[in-house]
């Protein structure tokens, strides 16, 4: 046994040899603290193993401890392990006694886990042949299911006959449901309470929640007889109280007659959705469902009007707890809803039911065969803080990671599952887990505990002479000092030496938290990343900035948190070279005069400039014309505009100098200015590659125009043009008048007038004759003659 342990330990050494740093860096002061530092850390309990640097050096990987001189028997490195308590072989073939059937292996084990380390165990499941079956038929007896009730009156005999081909031990039972008998789920008039179908008119039973009618029995004729006696009921809303019925059928184990060693099938038949959860608050029912059996002496659900409908989560818990497999037989309109429910409920299946339940027998047989062709594991118990993962190995030999289900299995085939378990921290308490196949009563019980203790902790020497005159207890190779004493061997008294001398300033941790105060002096911890040093362990050579993952860009040394760059390098993390060779263009100009050399690379300044040395610049133009804006601003600016001109020149990468430079190294330029002057200047480049403009001159400038004379000439020209136009107008008018007069004279000389009366003339005297006057004279003459 000892040789086997040594071989196992050496194997672990080889596996963990690559793990570096994390253990020693943790600063563990005891064996238990070391085990918590990491899953690959080990503790050396060998006496006098460390020097004054303290106990932290004892915690490291096993390989590093061996390299430091720790002997193998003194290395504490607990590993995760499995202790199998019970492992009966899986049953093969038919078993006479159902209590002897074993369908899962192993059956019981203890799992001790090192925090952070995984442990894998294998679970095997094999469904035995001729396994007993209990089938409970739960039917919706609302008015819409009347034709279905007539169809299943002979179902018992036919179902028993078909199931006898699959198992020799078959029992079936019957129950029914409608709805909670309370408003608003039913009408509450006296007539409707007595006969909910009175408005049709038709006689039906009063609304009820759930009735358990026939316990599980092998008498198929008894089932038929019970079904024939059933009558429908009615309610108002479309959803039914089916989930109330499922809950009672699952938890009322004794009354239903569920056997321990059998397959429990619950066939749920309905043509409507089901209420769940808080739907019952519409009826003022607010007490949550308690998940207990509430069948009275008449086998009716007595708490239908008191407790809420169960939630989906409550149904799942109780169905799994009682190993009940649910078969939803529902009509076309409801299939989608119940498929969603089945996805949440382990082992549940959905079948399409015809309008009159004509296919119920085929549906049940198909669902049974589907359930027997699948093996799925479920985990019960306290899993909080545990990491569990599954890998399925089905009968085709293919691995399915992260899957705990095998499909298309045959009865008698073996399904294997690799279960990987780990814990993340140490827990004093143990926990119990149960792994079981869905729908089967066989279980694997697992007791899980954390392995966080070292063997050396069982032995302790109080007031040991190894701890300087008995000033501490010796355990696992280190001294735990009594109050008032300190130091690796408890050789210093706290009243003699103050830890303030190990603090850089008041309020700072002792030895910067990276060392131990040993009798007034800091002994810095060892670090896998480098050295920790300084009177207060405040410095190290590994905490500087990194460039591309390299400390100080690999171009300098880290000293107390700052990079000290080597020759030819600069910058905060020594990533910037001072060499300008790569910035010099072919003509020897730094960045072609169009940029600045930054860290050995050209940063092009001119718009459009590109290339390693800014040599490409299609938009830069000729060097003379590109300086036009700078030159013209300089020539036209007064004292106040000099800053604006300096900005314009800076924008094109140039400066203007009054000094004279060598004409041999300068480029001569000439431009035509806005004022028609010829501007001449020279361009040169200094040692830094910057453009310098000098020797700026203006020549051949035209004289400015005589503005007063121009204005006088223009005015006289305008006046002269006006006079000429006026004369021309006068000549044209005179010519036209003369022409008209001559024409008139010619026409007058040709005219010959005749003597006669002007038809338009009227005389000055007019004679008017009064006709009335003549008659009046005649009348007077007549009167005279009569007289």
UniProtKB/Swiss-Prot annotation:
This is Integrin beta-6. The chain crosses the membrane at residues 709-729. Residues 22-71 form the PSI domain. GO terms for biological process: bone development; bronchiole development; cell adhesion mediated by integrin; cell morphogenesis; cell-matrix adhesion; cellular response to ionizing radiation; enamel mineralization; gene expression. Residues 22-708 are extracellular. Glycans are attached at residues 48, 97, 260, 387, 418, 463, 471, 541, 575. Disulfide bonds join 23-41, 31-454, 34-59, 44-70, 197-204, 252-293, 394-406, 426-452, 456-476, 467-479, 481-490, 492-519, 502-517, 511-522, 524-537, 539-560, 544-558, 552-563, 565-574, 576-599, 583-597, 591-602, 604-614, 617-620, 624-669, 630-649, 633-645, 677-701. Mg(2+) binds at residues 140, 142, 144, 240. PANTHER family: INTEGRIN BETA SUBUNIT, INTEGRIN BETA-6. Coiled coil: none annotated. Residues 730-787 are cytoplasmic. Gene3D superfamilies: 4.10.1240.30, Cytochrome c1, transmembrane anchor, C-terminal, Laminin, ligand-binding face of the semaphorins, domain 2, ntegrin, alpha v. Chain A, domain 3, von Willebrand factor, type A domain. Keywords: Calcium, Cell adhesion, Cell junction, Cell membrane, Disulfide bond, EGF-like domain, Glycoprotein, Integrin, Magnesium, Membrane, Metal-binding, Receptor, Repeat, Signal, Transmembrane, Transmembrane helix. The VWFA domain (or beta I domain) contains three cation-binding sites: the ligand-associated metal ion-binding site (LIMBS or SyMBS), the metal ion-dependent adhesion site (MIDAS), and the adjacent MIDAS site (ADMIDAS). This domain is also part of the ligand-binding site. Residues 131-371 form the VWFA domain. Heterodimer of an alpha and a beta subunit. Interacts with FLNB. Interacts with HAX1. ITGAV:ITGB6 interacts with FBN1. ITGAV:ITGB6 interacts with TGFB1. GO terms for molecular function: integrin binding; metal ion binding; molecular function activator activity. One of its GO terms (cellular component) is cell surface. Residues 730-757 are annotated as: Interaction with HAX1.
């Amino acid at each position: 046994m000892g040789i086997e342990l040594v071989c196992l330990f050496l194997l672990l050494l080889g596996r963990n040899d690559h793990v570096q740093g994390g253990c020693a860096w943790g600063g563990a002061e005891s064996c238990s603290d070391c085990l918590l530092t990491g899953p690959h850390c080990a503790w050396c309990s060998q006496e006098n193993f460390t020097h004054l640097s303290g106990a932290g050096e004892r915690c490291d990987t096993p390989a590093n401890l061996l390299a430091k001189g720790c002997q193998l028997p003194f290395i504490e490195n607990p590993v995760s392990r499995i202790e199998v308590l019970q492992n009966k072989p899986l049953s093969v073939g038919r078993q006479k006694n159902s209590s002897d059937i074993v369908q899962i292996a192993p059956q019981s084990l203890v799992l001790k886990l090192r925090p952070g380390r995984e442990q894998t165990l294998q679970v095997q499941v094999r469904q035995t042949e001729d396994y007993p079956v209990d089938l409970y038929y739960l039917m919706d007896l609302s008015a819409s299911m009347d034709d279905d009730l007539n169809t299943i009156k002979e179902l018992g005999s036919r179902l028993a006959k078909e199931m006898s081909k699959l198992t020799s031990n078959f029992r079936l039972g019957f129950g029914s449901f409608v709805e909670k008998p309370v408003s608003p789920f039913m009408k509450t008039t006296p007539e409707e309470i007595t006969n909910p179908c009175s408005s049709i008119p038709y006689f039906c039973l009063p609304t009820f929640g759930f009735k358990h009618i026939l316990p599980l029995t092998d008498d198929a004729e008894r089932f038929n007889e019970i079904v024939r006696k059933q009558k429908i009921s009615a309610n108002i809303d479309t959803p039914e109280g089916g989930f109330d019925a499922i809950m009672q059928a699952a938890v009322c184990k004794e009354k239903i007659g569920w056997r321990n060693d059998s397959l429990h099938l619950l066939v749920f038949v309905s043509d409507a959705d089901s209420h769940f959860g808080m739907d019952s608050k519409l009826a003022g029912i607010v007490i949550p469902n308690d998940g207990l059996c509430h069948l009275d002496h008449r086998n009716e659900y007595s708490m239908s009007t008191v407790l809420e409908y169960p939630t989906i989560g409550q149904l799942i818990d109780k169905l799994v707890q009682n190993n009940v497999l649910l078969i939803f037989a529902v009509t076309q309109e409801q299939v989608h809803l119940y498929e969603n429910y089945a996805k949440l409920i382990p082992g549940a299946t959905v079948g399409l039911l015809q309008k009159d339940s004509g296919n119920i027998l085929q549906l049940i047989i198909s669902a049974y065969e589907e359930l027997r062709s699948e093996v799925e594991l479920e985990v019960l118990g306290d899993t909080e803080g545990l990491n569990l993962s599954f890998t399925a190995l089905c009968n085709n030999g293919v691995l399915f990671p992260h899957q705990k289900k095998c499909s298309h299995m045959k009865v008698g085939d073996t399904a294997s599952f690799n279960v990987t378990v780990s814990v993340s921290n140490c827990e004093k308490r143990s926990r119990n887990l149960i792994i079981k196949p869905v729908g089967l009563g066989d279980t694997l019980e697992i007791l899980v505990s954390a392995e966080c203790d070292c063997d050396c902790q069982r032995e302790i020497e109080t007031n040991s002479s190894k701890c300087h005159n008995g000033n501490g207890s010796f355990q696992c190779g280190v001294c735990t000092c009594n109050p008032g004493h300190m130091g690796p061997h408890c050789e210093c008294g706290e009243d003699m030496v103050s830890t303030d001398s190990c603090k850089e300033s008041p309020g700072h941790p002792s030895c910067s938290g990276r060392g131990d105060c040993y009798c007034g002096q800091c002994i810095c911890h060892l670090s896998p990343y480098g050295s920790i040093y300084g009177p207060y362990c405040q410095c190290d050579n590994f905490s500087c900035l990194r460039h591309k993952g390299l400390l100080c860009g690999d171009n300098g040394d880290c000293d107390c948190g700052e990079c000290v760059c080597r020759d030819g390098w600069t910058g905060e993390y020594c990533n910037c070279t001072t060499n300008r060779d790569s910035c010099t263009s072919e003509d020897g100009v730094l960045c072609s005069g169009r940029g600045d050399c930054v860290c050995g690379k050209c940063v092009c300044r001119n718009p459009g400039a590109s290339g390693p040395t800014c040599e490409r610049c299609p938009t830069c133009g000729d060097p003379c014309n590109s300086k036009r804006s700078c030159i013209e601003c300089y020539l036209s600016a007064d004292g106040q505009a000099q800053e604006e001109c300096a900005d314009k020149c800076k924008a094109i990468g140039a400066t203007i100098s009054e000094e004279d430079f060598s004409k041999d190294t300068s480029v001569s330029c000439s431009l035509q200015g806005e004022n028609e002057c010829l501007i001449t200047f020279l361009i040169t480049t200094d040692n830094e590659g910057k453009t310098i403009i000098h020797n700026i001159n203006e020549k051949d400038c035209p004289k400015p125009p005589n503005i007063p004379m121009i204005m006088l000439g223009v005015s006289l020209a305008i006046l002269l043009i006006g006079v000429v136009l006026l004369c021309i107008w006068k000549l044209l008018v005179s010519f036209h008048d003369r022409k008209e007069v001559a024409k008139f004279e010619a026409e007058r000389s040709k005219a010959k007038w005749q003597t006669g009366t002007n038809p338009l003339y009227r005389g000055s005297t007019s004679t008017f004759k009064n006709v009335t006057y003549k008659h009046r004279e005649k009348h007077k003459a007549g009167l005279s003659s009569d007289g």
